[in-house]
């Protein structure tokens, strides 16, 4: 049984990632074109947002999304806060998860998988405990177990527990379940809290507060 469990993540999962990402990119190509034009109109250039993220074994890669913020600056030429730069169209892209469509190309190139722990920002790396670091034992995903169990309405510890549960139990059955539930949640727009609006505390700040509290 243990041998069968290893066959899927080592060989079959990558094959499915390639096949499904190619199919999705082809089928969604009209949406890519329309969203690209609208981003250019409402956000300006560039169309894509690029940011380094930790992948499997904490290896850094560039993750791409459609831009959801403008380049608005104050009178001194400094960018306004994230909350002030997210317009209605940007919020629409985030709540519908359309901003994440370019990640399919990261899946195709092998940097990500369709299912896995979500890739978080590089600045969080020093703040994971030994258990939480295991979320990087597999490739990050477009969606994951945490995304179908509360998404970013969860506390950080809860999210990481779901990530670790996935890492320890990855299987075709689990991936299929996560994909099906993700599609349902996207259409229902459930469990969505916009990052960059002050409603979600960054993990590094959250963990710093915990450490300071424990050291008192």
Each predicted region: which residue ranges?
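Short, glycine-rich, amphipathic interfacial segments at transmembrane boundaries or analogous
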Residues: 49-85, 143-161
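Generic recognition of short, well-ordered alpha-helical interface segments
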Residues: 10, 14, 61, 84-87, ...
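A hydrophobic, helix-centered structural microdomain
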Residues: 2-71, 178-216
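A short, structured surface patch at a secondary-structure boundary
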Residues: 82-139, 179-182
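Short, hydrophobic secondary-structure boundary micro-motifs
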Residues: 35, 49-50, 78, 115-117, ...
């Amino acid at each position: 049984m243990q041998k069968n469990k290893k066959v899927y993540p080592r060989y079959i999962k990558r094959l499915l990632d390639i096949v499904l990402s190619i199919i999705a990119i082809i089928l969604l190509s009209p949406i890519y074109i329309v969203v690209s034009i609208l981003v250019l109109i409402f956000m300006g250039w560039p169309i894509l947002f690029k940011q380094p993220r930790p992948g499997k074994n904490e290896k850094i890669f560039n993750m791409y999304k459609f831009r959801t913020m403008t380049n608005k600056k104050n009178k001194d030429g400094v960018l306004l806060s994230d909350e002030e730069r997210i317009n209605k169209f940007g919020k629409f892209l985030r709540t519908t998860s359309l901003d994440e469509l370019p990640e399919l190309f990261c899946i195709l190139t092998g940097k990500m998988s369709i299912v896995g722990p979500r890739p978080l920002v590089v600045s969080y790396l020093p703040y994971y405990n030994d258990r939480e670091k295991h979320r990087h034992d597999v490739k990050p995903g477009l969606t994951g177990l945490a995304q179908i169990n509360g998404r970013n309405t969860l506390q950080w510890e809860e999210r990481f527990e779901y990530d670790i549960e996935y890492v320890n139990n990855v299987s075709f059955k689990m991936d299929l379940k996560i994909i099906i539930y993700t599609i349902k949640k996207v259409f229902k727009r459930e469990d969505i809290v916009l990052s960059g609006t002050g409603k979600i505390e960054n993990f590094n700040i959250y963990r710093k507060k915990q450490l300071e509290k424990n050291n008192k």
